Amino acid sequence: MAPAMGNELQHRTVLLEEAVQALVTRADGVYVDGTFGRGGHSRLVLEKLAESGRLIAFDKDPLAIATAQQIADPRFGIVHESFASLRTAIAERGVGRVSGVLLDLGISSPQIDDPERGFSFRADGPLDMRMDPTRGESAADWLARATVQELTEVIRDYGEERFAFQIAKALVARRAESDRLGPLVSTGELAQIVANVVKTREKGKDPATRTFQAIRIHINQELAELQVVLEAALSLLEQGGRLVVISFHSLEDRIVKRFMQAHASTPAVDRRLPIRAVDLPSPPLKIIGRVFASDAEVAANPRARSAVMRVAERIAP
């Protein structure tokens, strides 16, 4: 999501102008901001909308919800749920089709920069990692029960970490020492355990980066929820409506890319079958393009370096 430096009031939204320009195609439309964060995209969308326009935003984070509730605009509504609940939430609000869906994936800078949230290895804090700290299982709770196989699969698949098995074994070995050392509950200790195992260092990257990413994705079911919301967005978009997705790592971007490509392609048919091309169903999406943060934005906000924005438009009725 939108990176920042410093405290939560200094929140820089990545690809702000580019995303909103791609999203808003009609001023009287109904739009969805699936990841409100601190409201950078939402506020600019509202500036672009006519009085008859409408914006519905989602976020899991109670602090994001508190920020959203300060927006006194009758065109705006906030939903304290994951964007995976998009289909249900839209129906509950009496909306049929929407004109655009924006997803700014990952964690926000206020979440990263607050040690109490447990997302970062740069400062010691509780091992939480939940987007919504009031719901679900924390990272510490999961680490206290996960098997070597479960740990290996999560760290390997969601962190693309080559030392996943060794890290998993080290974590389970540390758990065996809980009676003497107490449970593993701090980000600092987790980062140290990983650093002791990962001997090959990537230039400019902390050895704990991949493991922290993997555990966070698992705890919040980020990739599974992304699949759900992409399907929901496709079904809810009106003809001409836009799907705009900003990703910050390859796992997310791969899912988004493949989804858009799959729904922008005519189904493959065996040429031996008596079916004409004109008889095949038209694909529902058209890919508009891919956008990266500019050099100027990256210079001002280094966390924008990894951002990739993909845009597709629904062309089917």
Swiss-Prot record:
Coiled coil: none annotated. Transmembrane segments: none annotated. It is an enzyme of class 2 (transferase). NCBIfam families: 16S rRNA (cytosine(1402)-N(4))-methyltransferase RsmH (TIGR00006). Its EC number is 2.1.1.199. Specifically methylates the N4 position of cytidine in position 1402 (C1402) of 16S rRNA. Belongs to the methyltransferase superfamily. RsmH family. It catalyses: cytidine(1402) in 16S rRNA + S-adenosyl-L-methionine = N(4)-methylcytidine(1402) in 16S rRNA + S-adenosyl-L-homocysteine + H(+). GO terms for biological process: rRNA base methylation. One of its GO terms (molecular function) is rRNA (cytosine-N4-)-methyltransferase activity. S-adenosyl-L-methionine binds at residues 39-41, 59, 83, 104, 111. Keywords: Cytoplasm, Methyltransferase, rRNA processing, S-adenosyl-L-methionine, Transferase. This is Ribosomal RNA small subunit methyltransferase H. One of its GO terms (cellular component) is cytoplasm. It comes from Paraburkholderia phytofirmans (strain DSM 17436 / LMG 22146 / PsJN) (Burkholderia phytofirmans). It is found in: Cytoplasm.
